[in-house]
From Swiss-Prot:
Protein origin, superkingdom: Bacteria
Name of the protein in its database record: Ferrochelatase
Database matches in CDD domains: Ferrochelatase_C, Ferrochelatase_N
EC number: 4.98.1.1
Length: 391
């Protein structure tokens, strides 16, 4: 019987406070997270940003218990999905591959090879595709595949995007419905979709489909809610988690919260539409920061819809995705990782950065430059790093 490996891909997150700095470094080292024209400076810049942001990020993780629950929840999702698939007669084993923290994709690939898996289905835990999330994970997996003759022999099928999956839409709608019915005035409760933002240039210059898929997804959920409730609530879509001075997708979540409060909205049902697990953006950014902004602007009842986690209907929806992928037309790893023609990324391998002879001189020069910049800003209290929000 064919042994199928289900590779669940996600972002990853620091499980302890001391992991925050290295996690941020891995995140900002990815040219699909921060795109710069000179690839040599990618890793030095990642070191600088992660160093300057570590303290603030550590405080955020401390406020939710000292670390991210993302690995624990993703591994629970993997176990539940494996169980559901086996009940359906699929000889499946689930694996977790995190992009920026443990267990890394490379570790999952090693386990897949050791277990004698015959076929792999790749399922990113991002309902909506973006070059910076699913795309980055697909391309990391392709890089590992190209470098590994044994792994290259394994048939791989990919699920590129699933924002319109029936189980996902139904699960989201049901959890939103439950919160709406707890409001004092359910028919007038305002549904507030908040998605993780991406730079506007990703969509307008690079052709990222993320914005379209987020918007289509929110409409599908609203349609499902109307069938269940018999009425349409007012709703708004916004984007959160912006970093740096570059313009990101708008409207920004904090701005819309202020506008809704000032326009008289009293009951808000907040929906983290692009997140399928509880993590820092839901537990700290939404539950603490955005809730405080809402209260300051007169929104009395701030209700946040919980993340899907291992919600049974959601797990069944994921299982449907896998079985359809196995039975339907093949989407290869090359197809899934393909970028729009306009995207320009810079392979880090072409640029040395580390403690070796070829890099040591440049390491010293860059480090000295960074040190001088930081020292000047600390002395004068102003400059580009303050403008970027890093100091």
């Amino acid at each position: 019987m064919t042994r199928v490996g289900i590779l669940l891909m996600n972002l990853g997150g620091p499980e302890r406070i001391k992991d925050v700095g290295p996690f941020l470094y891995n995140l900002f080292s990815d040219p699909e997270i921060i795109r710069i024209p000179i690839p040599f400076f990618q890793k030095p810049l990642a070191w600088l940003i992660s160093t300057l942001r570590s303290s603030r990020s550590q405080q955020a993780y401390q406020s939710i218990g000292g670390g991210s629950p993302l690995r624990r929840i993703t591994e629970q999702q993997a176990r539940e999905l494996q169980s559901e698939l086996r009940q359906r007669g699929v000889n499946a084993t689930s694996y977790v591959a995190m992009r920026y923290w443990h267990p890394f994709t490379e570790s999952a690939v090693s386990d897949i090879k050791a277990d004698g898996i015959n076929q792999v289905v790749v399922l990113p835990l991002y309902p909506q595709f973006s070059i910076s999330t699913s795309g980055s994970s697909f391309r990391e997996l392709r890089r590992l595949r190209e470098a590994d003759p044994q792994f290259r022999k394994l048939p791989i099928r990919c699920i590129r995007s699933w924002f319109n999956n029936e189980g996902y839409i139904a699960s989201m709608a049901k959890l939103i419905e439950d919160e709406i019915l707890l409001c004092n005035d359910p028919e007038n409760a305002h549904i507030f979709f908040t998605a993780h933002g991406v730079p506007k240039s990703y969509v307008e210059e690079a052709g990222d489909p993320y914005k379209d898929e987020i918007e289509d997804c929110s409409i599908l959920i609203i349609d499902q809610l109307e069938k269940a409730l018999g009425y349409i609530n007012p709703y708004t879509l916004s984007y959160q988690s912006r970093v740096g001075p570059e313009e990101w997708l708008q409207p920004y979540t904090e701005d819309v919260l202020a506008e809704l409060g000032e326009s008289g909205t009293k009951e808000l049902v907040v929906v983290p539409i692009s997140f399928v697990s509880e993590h820092i953006e839901t537990l700290q950014e939404i539950d603490i920061e955005y809730k405080e902004i809402a209260k300051e602007h007169g929104i009395d009842n701030f209700r946040r819809v919980r993340a899907l986690d291992t919600y049974p209907m959601f797990i069944k929806g994921l299982a449907d995705l896998v079985t359809s992928c196995l039975e339907g037309p093949e989407i290869s790893l090359d197809e899934a990782s393909k970028l729009p023609d306009r995207v320009k990324l810079y392979p880090q391998e072409k640029w040395q950065w580390g403690w070796n002879n070829s890099a040591e001189v440049w390491n010293g020069r860059v480090a000295m430059f960074v040190f001088i910049i930081c020292l000047l800003e600390l002395v004068i209290g102003n400059g580009p790093l303050h403008y970027l929000g890093l100091l």
